[in-house]
Amino acid sequence: MTLPAAPANRLAAAAEAIRYHYDVGNEFYSLWLDRSLTYSCAMPDGPGDTLEAAQDRKLKYHLAAIEADRAGSVLDIGCGWGSLVRQLALGLRVPRCVGLTLSDEQAAYVRSRRYPGVEVRTENYLSYEPDAPFDGIVSIGAFEHFARPDDTRDTKVAVYRQFFDRCRGWLTDGGALSLQTIAYANMSRDDASEFMRTEVFPDADLPTLAEITAAADRIFEIKTVRNDRLDYAWTCEQWARRLREQREAAGQLAGAETVARYERYLRLSALGFRMGKLCLLRLVMRPYQGGYFGGTRAADGTRAGADGAGPRGAQAASR
């Protein structure tokens, strides 16, 4: 299998790409996102739903997936402007919440809210080293930024496997991972718009469901998979409408060219989801117990003992 690029190069490229898109300015995004500044696919309950209600429903879905109401600690990989950690801290009163982002603007915004028990770090998950395990991990809208356009399929799977391997090492044995990501559906990476690659999310490439399942093999059991592509079509259409209504104010903040670029990206994205070119995957995963699956060796190359206490479980319990 082709190994990923040198970590330093990949980390620097990822940080630069994230800041290009997300550091346009908090005020700009506040004009057209919902009140919680949730910048990811919502879960509408019908065409007449409000964006605020649909985003709240999505957050509650992920919190329920990891049983956050019983958690003592939760990690949010790609925390954005903190809508999930806010619900964890203020709604569920989870004592320890950590959010990772590569955007300086997002991190500053969340820190300014001073949510109890919340730590926000401007750090890539590849360099993050927690001092204690988590009961649950949520990652919404970060996974699609991990691979690069010049990665081979084997390299992409290796990059994704790094993510799953690290998440497994950070989770307690009874923990869960709730993952949400855009993915290629009835479209190849060669068909992807050059505009999207260069003007919207530079240096990023989407996964496929097959690549995700291959990368998680023998690390996580996939409990549920949802393809909610029409949810994202609806969300992008809501964002596009709200941005059009605030076009003049948005132009004063970010410039007319930036506003036009965002309007085009939202229109193209909505069309891609409507046509089935793109999909929106929501996966709930739990770590395999006992260190192995189906009689094969564990992801770290060792076998579980007869008592079922595999090496990964022992590591997680001792952290």
What are the roles of these predicted feature ranges?
Residues 1-31:
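N-terminal auxiliary segments of SAM/dcSAM-dependent transferases
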Residues 81-93:
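Conserved SAM-binding loop of SAM-dependent methyltransferases across substrates and taxa
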Residues 115-126:
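Conserved SAM-binding strand-loop segment of SAM-dependent methyltransferases
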Residues 126-140:
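A short acidic, Gly/Pro-enriched loop at the edge of an enzyme's catalytic core
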Residues 174-181:
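Conserved beta-strand signature within the Rossmann-like core of class I S-adenosyl-L-methionine
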Residues 182-282, 286-293:
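Substrate-binding/catalytic lobe of Class I Rossmann-like enzymes that use SAM or dcSAM, i.e.
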Residues 154-173:
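A short glycine-rich, Lys/Arg-flanked "PGG" loop and its adjoining helix->strand segment in the class I
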